[in-house]
Amino acid sequence: YIKGEVVLILDSDDYLTDDAIETVEKEWPLYRNCADICGMSYFRGKKDGSHLSVANAQDVYIDDDIHYRVNQKIKGDRCEVVRTVLLKKYPFPVYQGERFFPEGWFWNTLAMNYKTVYRNKTIYICEYLEGGLTKSGRALRMKCPLGMMDDCRMYLDNRVCIRRRVKEMLLYWVYA
């Protein structure tokens, strides 16, 4: 079903900037032959021009998601472009009766073996809707305990800072 070398997940009510595809087509070839790179991560922005992402110190920064985003507590939503082969290799778990699974699980799974190229460029525009996943996240997560326990387990790796590991251990017991 996915035919391209890389894929980007776009919510139905969001859109890409006019130069998004051109940007990816221009920048991805710089990293396509780097076996340790899983993809690229760009800014998400709002219609008013503000960012939902935190800028990197450099315009291009390469690191794994656990070290960069989790341990350094880098907040904000980003637009990830990932190798299609990896999206197929690591499918999201499905739990009967559960309708939500955190996307972060996938990025943490990739971070165990791959790095990401982080860019200070907006290519994705979104607005958070009332009643959407971001606004109703906690209630939704509580209705999906098996998936959330699976997600918490991802953070128990020794590469994750101790403070975050303790937090995820406690959350694991909440969902259990």
Question: Where are these predicted regions, by residue range?
Answer:
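The conserved acidic donor/metal-binding loop of glycosyltransferases
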Residues: 11-15
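C-terminal subregions of glycosyltransferases and related glycan-biosynthesis enzymes
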Residues: 117-176
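Conserved nucleotide-sugar donor-binding catalytic segment
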Residues: 46, 50-136
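Short aromatic/hydrophobic "clamp" motif used to bind/position activated sugar donors
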Residues: 7
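Conserved donor NDP-sugar-binding/catalytic core segment of glycosyltransferases
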Residues: 19-54
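Glycine-rich, basic loop-to-helix element that forms the pyrophosphate-binding segment
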Residues: 1-3
